[in-house]
Amino acid sequence: MEALLGYLLIFVARLTDVSMATIRMIMVVKGKRVIAACIGFVEVSIYVVAIGKVLSGMDNPLNVLAYASGFATGNYVGIFLEEKMALGNIIAQVISDYEVEKLVEKLRNVGFGVTVIEGYGREGIRYILNVSLQRKHLSRLYQTVEEHDKKAFVTVTDARAIRGGYFAGMKK
């Protein structure tokens, strides 16, 4: 029973510290220094406990298996948490040629700020709709665009910061 608890401790510790590492890296990229440092402190403290437990029992391959399993699961959980948290802002470009004025109106009615640029593509004139939004609202953007123009081309990029312009909250 004691050995099983040891494996579980190693697994859970590694799962936790790797998940935290994923979130910490996102905070680093987004310039959230203090939050990243705090997460890093807790993360490395947990890591030291896990690696200490493994190194003290290197003769037991199940310790290594628990460590590796916790690492792999921690990556999965970290990515899952990051997707659910949907932190930060993004910029979406919607390229369409189908009743663009109506699409712009729909997007604005939902609460998105939209800037329209005329462009020229392989098939002629296209309109590029630049939309800055919070990541948590991306599915709403996709849904609104899809309802209007199933053939619209949408690209999304991360935005480190957004300043000025129209950046309203979503309407119900």
Swiss-Prot record:
Its main location: membrane. Keywords: Cell membrane, Membrane, Transmembrane, Transmembrane helix. It is a multi-pass membrane protein. It comes from the Bacteria. Pfam families: DUF2179, DUF5698. The chain crosses the membrane at residues 3-23, 34-54, 61-81. The keyword Hydrolase does not apply. One of its GO terms (cellular component) is plasma membrane. It is found in: Cell membrane. The keyword Plastid does not apply. InterPro entries: DUF2179, DUF5698, N-reg_PII/ATP_PRibTrfase_C, UPF0316. HAMAP family: UPF0316. NCBIfam families: PRK04164.1-2, PRK04164.1-5. Belongs to the UPF0316 family. This is UPF0316 protein Clos_0555. It comes from Alkaliphilus oremlandii (strain OhILAs) (Clostridium oremlandii (strain OhILAs)).
